[in-house]
């Protein structure tokens, strides 16, 4: 499985992880990148800090950052590039997904062929 973080995304995620990790010591702590049902196009991305992987997680390493991807999200995240933009009008993670057949105008949600769940309107 290939999931790539740009330098900016890796730096931002490592910063989050370090600020979260000061109180606890876990050698398996990392970032979970997942796809969940939701958003206006059916799927939405999720990034969370976790202390340990689940049994079915794929484990990826980029630099000093451990990335976990669950087996259901893996096909939808194959080939994804995650970037972090910090601009005047918008800041946050941006996903470039070759599996997306359509994306929402808000940029936070996507469809992946006929298997996408029904979306809800942007608010």
UniProtKB/Swiss-Prot annotation:
One of its GO terms (molecular function) is iron ion binding. It comes from the Bacteria. Keywords: Nitrogen fixation. GO terms for biological process: iron-sulfur cluster assembly; nitrogen fixation. Gene3D superfamilies: HesB-like domain. InterPro entries: FeS_biogenesis (IPR000361), FeS_cluster_insertion (IPR016092), FeS_cluster_insertion_CS (IPR017870), HesB-like_dom_sf (IPR035903). May be required for efficient nitrogen fixation. PANTHER family: IRON-SULFUR CLUSTER ASSEMBLY 2 HOMOLOG, MITOCHONDRIAL (PTHR43011:SF1). Belongs to the HesB/IscA family. This is Protein HesB, vegetative. It comes from Trichormus variabilis (strain ATCC 29413 / PCC 7937).
């Amino acid at each position: 499985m290939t999931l790539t973080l740009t330098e900016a995304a890796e730096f931002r995620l490592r910063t989050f992880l370090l600020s979260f990790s000061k109180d606890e010591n876990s050698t398996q702590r990392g970032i979970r990148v997942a796809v969940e049902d939701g958003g206006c196009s059916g799927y939405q991305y999720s990034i969370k800090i976790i202390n340990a992987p689940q049994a079915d997680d794929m484990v990826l390493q980029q630099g000093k950052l451990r990335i976990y991807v669950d087996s259901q999200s893996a096909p939808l995240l194959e080939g994804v590039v995650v970037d972090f933009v910090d601009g005047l009008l918008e800041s946050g993670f941006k996903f470039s997904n070759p599996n997306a057949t359509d994306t929402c105008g808000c940029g936070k949600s996507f469809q992946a062929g006929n298997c996408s769940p029904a979306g809800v309107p942007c608010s």
